[in-house]
Every structure is written in structure tokens, then in C-alpha cells.
A protein has these predicted regions:
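Intrinsic disorder at enzyme termini
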Residues: 1-9
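A non-catalytic, amphipathic alpha-helix used as a structural packing/dimerization or gating element
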Residues: 9-23
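C-terminal helix-coil-helix/basic helical segment that borders enzyme active sites and/or dimer interfaces
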Residues: 26-37
Length: 134
């Protein structure tokens, strides 16, 4: 029984993303791991190819896709063997706060850059009582 109902569009997206990873990510994963950083150009290539913030509305340059596009990105990234290009943190954890809570002016200012990879978001938090600093 198939739980996730992928459409033909989803499968085509998966194939495109897999080819992108084979060309633009996997060959460099060890180099990035040793350097301790993923170059900004990798984010920009991923964004310009349409693989960042897949759920962001086309009004801001996004795909306007459903959640399954994000699932595909996560699934395919797991096969690369790299840990640095954590696009799901950017696309699926941080950016949704902007889409849900930012004013229209802030959405117009930041979302296009998030989608294109010109802006890379992050999250930082602290729980002083439990001494957790992420």
C-alpha cells in the first residue's frame, strides 16, 4: 500500500532533483565536509533550479507546490551522504514562519531571495534551564 500519493509531476521533479544532486552536490560532499561549509553557490544553484522553498507561492518566485515536493527533497538529500546542505531546515522550518507570520512587505522583501538561494536562513535557539544551545 502506497501511503504517499506521488503524481507524475512529483516523479518528474524527483528525477530532475536526483540529476541535480548527482551533478552539483554528491561530487563535492566530501570537500564541503572537510571545509565545514557548503559554498553559497551551491544554495544559489539549488534555488535557481527550483529546489528550495517548493511550497512558497509563485507570487514570490516559488513552485507553489504541495508538501510532497518537500518530502522528495528530503528523501533525495538522504542519499547524497552529505550533511552540510540542509535545505529542509531553510525551506521547511524557517521559511514557513515568514510565509505564515510576516507582513506582505517582508514577504516581498525576503521570500524571493529565500527561493532563489540568495538568502540562506537559519535558526538559533537556547534553552537556558536545560543548557541547550542550538
Amino acid at each position: 500500500m502506497e501511503i504517499l500519493k506521488y503524481t507524475e509531476d512529483h516523479q518528474n521533479f524527483r528525477k530532475r532533483f536526483r540529476r541535480f544532486l548527482e551533478k552539483e552536490v554528491t561530487p563535492y560532499a566530501d570537500e564541503w565536509e572537510k571545509a565545514g561549509i557548503v559554498p553559497k553557490t551551491a544554495w544559489e544553484k539549488m534555488g535557481r533550479a527550483g529546489f528550495l522553498c517548493t511550497e512558497v507561492s509563485s507570487d514570490y518566485g516559488g513552485l507553489g507546490g504541495d508538501f510532497l515536493y518537500s518530502v522528495i527533497v528530503i528523501e533525495e538529500l538522504t542519499h547524497t551522504g552529505q550533511n552540510g546542505l540542509i535545505a529542509p531546515l531553510h525551506s521547511d522550518i524557517v521559511v514557513p514562519y515568514i510565509t505564515a507570520y510576516a507582513s506582505d512587505a517582508l514577504k516581498k522583501k525576503y521570500l524571493p531571495g529565500c527561493v532563489s538561494g540568495d538568502i540562506v536562513t537559519a535558526v538559533a535557539m537556547t534553552e537556558p534551564v536545560s543548557y541547550t544551545h542550538l
